[in-house]
C-alpha cells in the first residue's frame, strides 16, 4: 500500500514538473499598436515560439509613455513594441530601455532606428497623419475639401473638426511637433490657436477622429492615415488627404527587462515574417526586403514634414504643458 502511494506521488510530481517545464513563459509587452491588430501579431509570434506567451498591455502613445516613465524605478514591462520613436528616445534617455542588438538588424532601414551608436530601439514601421474627410457629410454641409493646413482655419469648418489630444495620443503629438518644427515656434502656436476655433473636440485616441469622420459624427478628422485607408477600404465615404507638412514617426521595439524570452520577442518583431504583417497596414516598414502598398493609402512621401525625433522627445514635456494650458478645455472626457 505504501509503495503504491509513493509511486502515485512520484508520478504526480513528475507530471507537475513536466507541465511546468513546458508551460509557456509569459512576456509582458507594452504597446500603442491599434487594438484590432494585436491578436494577429500575438498569434503569429506564438505559432513560431510556442514556449512564450505575449501579455499585451495597450494604451495610446502618450498614456503608455507616461506609464513607462512612472514605472521607471519598478518597471513592469519587459518589452515595448509599437511605440513612437520620439517616446522611445525619451525612454532610452531615462534609462528605461536597455541597449540590445537583435538578430537580423542588418536587414532594417536605418532611418527608422535609434540613431545613436548604442542602439536600444528599432523601427517596425513608419506611420503618418492625414486628414480624413467625409464626402457625404461635406456635401450635406456644403464644405469644400481642404487642400492645406491653412484651409482648416477657415470659418466654414467651425465645429466640424476632431483631432487627437497630443498629451494622450502620439498621433496628435507628432502633428503638433510637425507644425512647430516646420512653421517655427511662434507661427506654429498661432496656427494652432486659429485651428482651435474650428475644433469640435480633442480625442484621447489617435485613430478616433478618423473613425468619427467615417461615421459622420464630424466632417473632418486629423488622424492616422492607416486608419483612414482601412475605413475607406471597408466602405466609409472618406477621402484621405495629406496636406504638405504631414507628421510622421517610426513605431519601434525595445528591451526593458533583459531575458532570453524578451529578446526573442524583439528578434521576431523585426523579422521578415513580422514585417509582412506590418505592410498590410503601413506603407513603409522596417525590413528592407518587404515592400508593398496598403490599400487606399495616400501618397504620403511627397508631403512628409521634416522631423527631428530627438527634438520631439526632449521638447515633449514643455510642448504638452503649453498645449494643455491653451487647448485642453475642448478635450473629450477620459473613459
Segments (PLM) and residue ranges:
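Early extracytoplasmic/lumenal segment of secretory-pathway proteins
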Residues: 24-89, 211
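A ligand-binding cleft/hinge motif common to bilobed small-molecule-binding domains
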Residues: 86-90, 214-237
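Extracytoplasmic ligand-binding site segments that recognize negatively charged/polar headgroups
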Residues: 32-39, 76-217
Amino acid at each position: 500500500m505504501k509503495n503504491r502511494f509513493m509511486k502515485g506521488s512520484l508520478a504526480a510530481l513528475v507530471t507537475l514538473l513536466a507541465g511546468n517545464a513546458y508551460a509557456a513563459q509569459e512576456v509582458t509587452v507594452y504597446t500603442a499598436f491599434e487594438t484590432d491588430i494585436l491578436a494577429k501579431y500575438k498569434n503569429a509570434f506564438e505559432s513560431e515560439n510556442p514556449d512564450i506567451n505575449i501579455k499585451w498591455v495597450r494604451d495610446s502613445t502618450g498614456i503608455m509613455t507616461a506609464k513607462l516613465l512612472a514605472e521607471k524605478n519598478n518597471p513592469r514591462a519587459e518589452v515595448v513594441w509599437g511605440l513612437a520613436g520620439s517616446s522611445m528616445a525619451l525612454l532610452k534617455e531615462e534609462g528605461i530601455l536597455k541597449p540590445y542588438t537583435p538578430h537580423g538588424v542588418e536587414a532594417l532601414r536605418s532611418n527608422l532606428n535609434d540613431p545613436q551608436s548604442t542602439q536600444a530601439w528599432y523601427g517596425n514601421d513608419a506611420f503618418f497623419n492625414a486628414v480624413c474627410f467625409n464626402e457625404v457629410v461635406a456635401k450635406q454641409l456644403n464644405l469644400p475639401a481642404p487642400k492645406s493646413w491653412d484651409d482648416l482655419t477657415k470659418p466654414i469648418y467651425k465645429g466640424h473638426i476632431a483631432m487627437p489630444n497630443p498629451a494622450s495620443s502620439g498621433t496628435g503629438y507628432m502633428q503638433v511637433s510637425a507644425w512647430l518644427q516646420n512653421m517655427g515656434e511662434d507661427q506654429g502656436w498661432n496656427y494652432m490657436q486659429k485651428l482651435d476655433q474650428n475644433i469640435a473636440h480633442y480625442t484621447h485616441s489617435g485613430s478616433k477622429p478618423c473613425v468619427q469622420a467615417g461615421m459622420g459624427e464630424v466632417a473632418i478628422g486629423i488622424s492616422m492615415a492607416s486608419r483612414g485607408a482601412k475605413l475607406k477600404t471597408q466602405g466609409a465615404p472618406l477621402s484621405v488627404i495629406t496636406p504638405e507638412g504631414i507628421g510622421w514617426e517610426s513605431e519601434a521595439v525595445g528591451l526593458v527587462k533583459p531575458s532570453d524570452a524578451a529578446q526573442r520577442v524583439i528578434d521576431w518583431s523585426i523579422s521578415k515574417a513580422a514585417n509582412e504583417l506590418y505592410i498590410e497596414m503601413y506603407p513603409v516598414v522596417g525590413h528592407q526586403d518587404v515592400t508593398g502598398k496598403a490599400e487606399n493609402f495616400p501618397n504620403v512621401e511627397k508631403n512628409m514634414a521634416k522631423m527631428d525625433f530627438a527634438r520631439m522627445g526632449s521638447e515633449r514635456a514643455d510642448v504638452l504643458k503649453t498645449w494643455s494650458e491653451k487647448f485642453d478645455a475642448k478635450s473629450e472626457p477620459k473613459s
